[in-house]
């Protein structure tokens, strides 16, 4: 990558992470990788032959395959670290820790006081996410004790957490799951969201960028940058 003077960053278009404003890239992940580009060129003393970060927008479900197939070199998105994913990719130093997966409901929610109250309720999530897996396990546990399962609805796999939060806010779907950091941020923008910070599907999670297992040097550079 340094030899080709290009690092290809896989990004998911969203309202905050990566988007274009009047033809110019913007967003949290754009700004982070723009800083990383400067960090790499300073550290490696590239001089006039600078290494550039190129952004490749993909759909959420394409992130892993695009990385493994060599379309991009780094997943520039907060991916939830899981043992299964660690078998396939190299994760960086976490960009977020103590991550919780929480329930978010809309403007006319049915009362939800704890996880048990999800029995018989509709929840919409992207089926490719760890949220879906966790909801499936919880729903199965309800059925084993004779309670109604969660009415688990598969959202379109193109939809991001932000998309689903907007749909919940508009009353189009009753509830979804996202991480606590994202829920807190968007509740300040979307006034009809009801957060349930104490209803936690999973906790103590970590968010990280990811590289291929054959890119330890890139992962090392990312780790050093994240720690600065």
Name each model feature, range by range.
Residues 1-3, 67-70, 94-98, 117, ...:
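Extracellular/periplasmic catalytic domains that process cell-envelope and extracellular macromolecules
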Residues 1-87, 154-158, 222:
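Extracytoplasmic small-molecule ligand-binding "clamshell" domains
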Residues 6-13, 89-113, 209-213:
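Hydrophobic/proline-rich hinge and linker segments of small-molecule sensing/allosteric domains
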Residues 11-15, 57-59, 95, 107, ...:
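A mature extracytoplasmic/lumenal domain signature
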Residues 61-62, 68, 73-88, 134-143, ...:
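A ligand-binding cleft/hinge motif common to bilobed small-molecule-binding domains
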Residues 106-187:
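Pocket-lining segment of extracytoplasmic ligand-binding domains
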């Amino acid at each position: 990558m340094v030899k080709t003077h290009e690092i290809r960053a896989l990004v998911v278009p969203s309202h905050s992470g990566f988007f274009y404003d009047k033809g110019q890239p913007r967003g949290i992940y754009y700004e982070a990788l723009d800083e990383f580009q400067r960090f790499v060129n300073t550290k490696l003393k590239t001089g006039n032959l600078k290494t550039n970060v190129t952004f490749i927008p993909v759909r959420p479900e394409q992130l892993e395959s695009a990385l493994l197939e060599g379309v991009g070199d780094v997943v520039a998105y907060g991916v939830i670290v899981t043992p299964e994913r660690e078998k396939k990719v190299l994760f960086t130093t976490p960009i977020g820790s103590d991550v919780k997966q929480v329930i978010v409901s809309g403007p006319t929610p049915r009362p939800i006081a704890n996880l048990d109250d999800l029995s018989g309720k509709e929840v919409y999530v992207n089926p490719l996410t760890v949220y879906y897996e966790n909801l499936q396990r919880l729903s199965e546990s309800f059925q084993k004790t004779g309670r109604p399962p969660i009415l688990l609805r598969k959202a379109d796999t193109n939809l991001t957490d932000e998309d689903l939060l907007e749909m919940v806010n508009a009353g189009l779907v009753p509830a979804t799951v996202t991480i606590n950091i994202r829920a807190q941020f968007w509740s300040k923008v979307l006034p009809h969201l009801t957060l349930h910070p104490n209803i936690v599907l999973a906790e103590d999670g970590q968010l990280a960028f990811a590289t291929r297992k054959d890119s330890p040097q890139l992962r090392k550079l990312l780790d050093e940058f994240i720690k600065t």
